[in-house]
């Protein structure tokens, strides 16, 4: 898939909470503030949004309400990763069915997959959905990191459009851009690295 989901600043939203559950009025205000402020894409239920600790029902309501509210003004991307491939597929399908423009899928954590295993995991998820998939590489949290060669393999899949690269390695960003070409976007996953990553040819930042 040659067209990037977005260029610029994608913000991983917090999930506002009250003692009784999700604070949807606060989430609505947050979404409107970001759109008015020029944020280029909104990311729901990812690390910052505590997606790993939300229930399936909570996730579904967040996605449905947010997609309806945004109404196509900016891309809505949903964190759907899991260390269980079947769960990542199910979460990704549910997000796409609810109207998400794309999914953000973290490398499987805890199990420490091989590079071949990572390719098989992301390929299985990408095969199961009809929307763009962004790989999320954050080895400080997952214990495993993709290589540039792995990205080059994944970039051949029509649904895998890029990576949120949060390894902290400029060398990996540069090598990935060199190997994968213009059809595979690299977003910095570290706010402090966004300018240098963009200067190297990156698509922006997701943070």
Segments and roles (model prediction):
Residues 2-143:
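Active-site beta->alpha loop and helix N-cap motifs at the rims of alpha/beta catalytic domains
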Residues 124-128, 139-207:
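Catalytic alpha/beta core domains of metabolic enzymes, predominantly
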């Amino acid at each position: 898939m040659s067209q990037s989901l977005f260029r610029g600043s994608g913000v991983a939203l917090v999930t506002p909470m009250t003692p009784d559950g999700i604070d949807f009025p606060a989430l609505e205000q947050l979404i409107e503030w970001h759109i008015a402020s020029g944020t280029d894409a909104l990311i729901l239920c990812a690390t910052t949004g505590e997606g790993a600790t939300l229930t399936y029902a909570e996730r579904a309501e967040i996605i449905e309400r947010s997609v309806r509210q945004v109404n196509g003004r900016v891309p809505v991307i949903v964190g759907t990763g899991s260390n269980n491939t079947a769960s990542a597929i199910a979460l990704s399908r549910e997000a796409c069915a609810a109207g998400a423009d794309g999914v953000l899928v973290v490398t499987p954590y805890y199990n420490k997959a091989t590079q071949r295993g990572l390719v098989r995991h992301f390929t299985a998820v990408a095969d199961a959905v009809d929307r763009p998939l962004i790989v999320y590489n954050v080895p400080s949290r997952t214990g495993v990191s993709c290589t540039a060669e792995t990205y080059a393999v994944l970039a051949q899949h029509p649904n895998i459009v890029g990576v949120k690269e949060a390894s902290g390695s400029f060398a990996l960003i540069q090598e990935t851009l060199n190997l994968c070409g213009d059809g595979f976007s690299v977003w910095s996953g570290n706010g402090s690295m966004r300018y240098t990553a963009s200067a190297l040819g990156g698509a922006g930042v997701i943070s």
